[in-house]
Amino acid sequence: MSIEDFRNHCLSLKEVSEEMPFDKSKNDYAHNILMVSIDNKWFCLVNIEVFYCCILKSSRNVSTNLQAEYDAVHPAYHMNHRHWISVFFNQDMPNSHIIEHVDEAYHHVLSSLPKYECDKLA
């Protein structure tokens, strides 16, 4: 999977926006982080220059199960380990499953929005 394919899939989800929140950072790695969100609630982070993993919002149960099933899934570095996972590309998780979990992260955040926000997005 390429960064273009990954980004295009993320942006194909309804009412999604992207941002480079750390673009003023002096740290080269942080400078290239693309944040994908719905209603300013993050659900995915990925480095567009060093495309080796993505960080996804996840429920604790899903996170625990994925970490047990795949070597490619770890608690997300510098994020709350109960709510975020790192998924490494080109390991034992097929790209199709990674895309499914991007969608799951999107729906996880969407379901946490207040009803009036969800109604605006419908």
What do the predicted segments below correspond to?
Residues 1-122:
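Charge-dense, helix-prone N-terminal extensions
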